[in-house]
């Protein structure tokens, strides 16, 4: 989640493009709380209560950045991500403008089938792994799943290794 937030903020600050950060970790949504936002509505409201997406989107204090927050835990997250309404939302957000970048924050790949369910709606995947937490077997399983995707890179998170002092 922090990697998705940092990526979205960086893209919004470095480009003349709008960036929409969508919290699709529906089992453990954290984007709004990490950004200090208090949403009146969330993606759950859009998906289950017919709240228009315009009422869900928030504008934090970062120029060019919009956030579609999650708010409460949804037990049927895979079903929600596979729904027609989610497909329409993904298409709507992506086609908002040719210069709009949409960053989807997803739950861990192997903990639920949410990412697999949502894969048809993404153009590219940035894989985040945690040093000393992600197992080799999980990396191998994930690599098999990514063969069908445009994997643009891997981020090593929680690294404690330091560069040599003569690095620069």
Language model: regions and residue ranges:
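P-loop NTP-binding module
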Residues: 2-168
């Amino acid at each position: 989640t922090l990697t998705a937030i940092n990526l979205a903020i960086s893209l919004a600050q470095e480009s003349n493009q709008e960036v929409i950060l969508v919290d699709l970790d529906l089992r453990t949504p954290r984007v709004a709380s990490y950004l200090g936002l208090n949403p009146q509505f969330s993606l759950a409201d859009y998906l289950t209560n017919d709240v228009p997406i315009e009422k869900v989107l928030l504008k934090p204090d970062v120029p060019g950045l919009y956030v579609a927050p999650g708010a409460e835990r949804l037990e049927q997250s895979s079903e929600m991500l596979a729904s027609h309404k989610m497909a329409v939302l993904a298409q709507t957000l992506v086609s908002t403008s040719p210069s709009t970048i949409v960053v989807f924050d997803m739950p861990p790949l192997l903990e639920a089938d949410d990412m697999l369910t949502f894969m048809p709606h993404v153009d590219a995947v940035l894989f985040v792994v945690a040093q000393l937490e992600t197992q080799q077997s999980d990396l191998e399983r994930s690599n098999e799943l990514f063969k069908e995707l445009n994997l643009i890179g891997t981020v090593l998170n929680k690294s404690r290794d330091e560069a040599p002092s003569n690095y620069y």
